[in-house]
Curated annotation (Swiss-Prot):
Keywords: Lipid-binding, Phosphoprotein, SH3 domain. GO terms for biological process: integrin-mediated signaling pathway; regulation of neutrophil degranulation. It comes from Mus musculus (Mouse). The keyword Aminoacyl-tRNA synthetase does not apply. The modification Phosphoserine is found at S374. InterPro entries: FYB1/2-like, hSH3, SH3-like_dom_sf, SH3_domain. This is PML-RARA-regulated adapter molecule 1. May be phosphorylated on tyrosines. Gene3D superfamilies: SH3 Domains.
């Protein structure tokens, strides 16, 4: 209970400062208020306290506010009465509302700060509650009231409690019921008060704004009760609705109770009074300057009705709420009638100002209920969410009228959910989608083709062109095709230069061609760019293809298979070419060299050196079979490019070839032997 400790600290501070400030305020407000009371009617007095309260509100000084309050209202007589017997009077009222006593006990530890400020501020029945909030007003109100209220006997009653016992009982009773009703409400809304209690005692302890509404209440009492000046002043806090008649006072202890709990509730429950008191707070637009007076009436509604639901249902339902209240609704109704007669009309306007009033009073809204009540009913409906559903079915009959597609129906539903009050008209949605579909159909349809012209309009077909003059040289076409391919590959001036010289190279002998290869090999590979190498290959290919000799064709394929960039490969190629020439001379081999198959030398075979027309045998070496010369020997070529005879006994067919030739028999057996 941090709030209780803070409250106690403030009590000690205020008690220490009581005599000084009390003396100052006693001296200053007495002459002013006495003069005002003598010269002007209480209505004017009510205006002066309002002005002074406003100035004090701006200053946010709690002590001067209480002093003026004490000066203006009826507090001193009541404190006198309560000093003698504050608790015994409470049991008097306890007979009427038994509930008040029960909540009071638990509430004092929990809401001690709340109850005491309400008593000190509104009723000032006890001096100890006043020092808690501001000990200043206790002392000044006594002399001031002694001076101010010379007319009413009630002012004298505090000094002489036996003179009007009935009135004393009535007055203390309203003061005490103020607590019980405030406590009745804690029973009703115990949790909310417990939550809001620390907040309310804090403003009461700081005595910043909770005391401000006290002034408006006192002012209200003066303005309302101008005829029974002193009596109405004393009783006004108990029930400002009283017309100053003591008969009403006899019946109004209960309504006074309601008024006091209203004040107590202002500190305890700013949220509920505002939430449920939305209808009643507008009735008190006169207290725009004093925010607690509007919540005080709504608070009175809450303790009386014991349920904020009737207030939520309708703002203007003031009388039905007053009816269920057994205690004070009779008194609260006259209060409403007298105080806000002028303001009952601007109720709708006041609704907008209610949130500002709690801000002035610094009464926090701890519940969302006041927010719903402050809003007009039109806005309440969408918030509750119950009225969205009837609006949706209204819009639904329009939706099925839309073209029957799931996507189309979904679009209006989504948009209607965002703004149910303005359902989308089908006219806005329908035309867009069908247009889209029509466009899609048009796009899907193939474009119209123009009809072909008739054969008669075209006439006879043109005649074929004449053949070129002279004999046709087919090789020239081949050369042209080769040059075109070379141009496409190279695309450079050097390539075209070599192509222009191609016919001369073709006419040259094969030896000259080999010399060309030698010249190419002599150049350093590093000096040749990639483009230059490609050009050289293209020129070589162009020169070889036109030749009809099979040997040249075979030789031409080798450089294609092996990249010419590697100098080692080039050397091997040249050696192979020389070996082939020697082979042709030695074996007198004519025709094209064709590789029939490849065979491997048996790894178990005996090795031997080659000599004469025989190749050397090396285990596991693969040889290319060029000719099946006899049953014993075959003409082969080794990987080095040498040619010679190899005995059949040393050769083994490759596994791949064996599987490929299984169905056709051994190719060696099928090969006819030469004679």
């Amino acid at each position: 209970m941090g709030s209780n400790q803070d409250f106690r600290n403030l009590q000690a501070k205020f008690q220490t400062s009581q005599p000084e400030l009390g003396e100052l305020f006693r001296k200053t407000p007495k002459p002013e208020l006495n003069k005002v009371l003598k010269k002007f009617p209480q209505t004017e007095l009510s205006e002066q306290p309002k002005k002074s309260s406003q100035s004090e509100l701006s200053a946010v000084s709690l002590k001067p506010l209480q002093l003026q309050f004490a000066d203006l209202p009826r507090k001193p007589p009541q404190p006198g009465v309560l000093k003698k017997s504050p608790q015994p009077e409470f049991p008097h009222l306890a007979n009427k509302p038994v509930q008040a006593e029960f909540p009071r006990k638990p509430l004092h530890p929990e809401f001690t700060g709340l109850k005491k400020p309400s008593q000190a501020e509104f009723t000032d029945l006890k001096k100890p509650p006043q020092p808690q909030f501001a000990s200043l007003p206790k002392k000044p109100p006594k002399p001031e009231f002694g001076e101010l209220s010379k007319r009413p006997p009630q002012l004298e009653t505090p000094q002489e409690p036996s003179a009007p016992p009935a009135q004393k009982l009535l007055k203390p009773e309203p003061n005490n019921p103020a607590r019980p009703l405030g406590e009745l409400k804690p029973k009703m809304f115990w949790h909310l008060e417990a939550n809001e209690a620390p907040k309310r005692p804090l403003p009461s302890e700081s005595s910043t704004f909770p005391k401000k509404p006290l002034q408006p209440e006192a002012v209200v009492g003066f303005s309302r009760k101008s005829q029974p000046q002193s009596e109405s002043i004393e009783v006004s806090q108990t029930s400002p609705s009283k017309c100053g008649s003591r008969e009403l006072d006899s019946h109004s202890p209960q309504p006074d109770i309601s008024t006091f709990p209203k004040n107590n509730e202002n500190f305890r429950k700013p949220s509920y009074p505002q939430a449920t008191g939305c209808p009643k707070s507008p009735k008190q637009p006169m207290f725009y300057e004093f925010p607690q007076t509007p919540p005080r009436k709504p608070e009175s509604c809450n303790p009386q009705s014991h349920s904020p639901l009737p207030d939520f249902n309708a703002f203007p339902k003031k009388h039905p709420q007053l009816q269920p209240s057994d205690l004070t609704r009779a008194s609260s109704e006259p209060e409403v009638c007298k105080v806000p007669k002028k303001t009952q009309k601007p109720d709708p306007n006041v609704l907008s100002q209610k949130p500002s009033q709690p801000e002035l009073g610094h009464l926090p809204r701890t519940s969302s209920d006041p927010e719903f009540n402050s809003l007009p009913r039109k806005f309440l409906q969408p918030q509750h969410g119950k009225f969205f559903q009837p609006e949706f079915p209204k819009g639904l009959p329009r939706k099925p009228k839309l073209p029957g597609s799931v996507s189309e129906c979904s679009l209006p539903s989504a948009s209607a959910g965002s703004s149910p009050q303005c359902p989308l008209s089908p006219g806005l949605i329908v035309p867009g989608i069908p247009r889209w579909r029509s466009e899609d159909f048009q796009v899907q349809r193939p474009p119209r083709r123009r009809p072909l012209p008739s054969a008669s309009s075209l006439g006879h077909p043109p005649a074929k062109p004449a053949l070129p003059p002279g004999p046709i040289n087919i090789q020239s076409f081949r050369r042209a095709a080769a040059t075109a391919a070379a141009v496409l590959k190279t695309g450079s001036s050097t390539g075209t230069h070599f192509q222009a010289q191609q016919p001369q190279h073709i006419a040259q002998n094969p030896d000259e061609i080999y010399e060309l290869y030698d010249a190419v090999e002599a150049t350093d590979d590093s000096s040749i760019s990639p483009r230059g190498r490609d050009e050289m290959l293209s020129t070589q290919q162009a020169t070889r293809w036109p030749q009809q000799e099979p040997e040249l064709r075979k030789k031409a394929t080798q450089p294609q298979q092996l990249p010419a960039t590697d100098p080692k490969l080039l050397k091997q190629i040249r050696k192979a070419e020389k070996a082939e020439r020697e082979f042709r001379k030695k074996f007198k081999f004519e025709g094209e060299i064709v590789i029939h198959t490849k065979m491997m030398i048996d790894p178990n075979a005996k090795t031997r050196r080659g000599g004469g027309k025989h190749l050397g045998i090396r285990r596991g070496e693969i040889l290319e079979v060029i000719e099946f010369t006899s049953k014993d020997e075959m003409l082969c070529r080794d990987p080095k490019g040498k040619y010679g005879y190899v005995p059949r006994t040393a050769l083994l067919p490759l596994e791949t070839e064996v599987y490929d030739d299984v169905s056709f028999g051994d190719p060696l057996d099928m090969q006819p032997f030469p004679r």
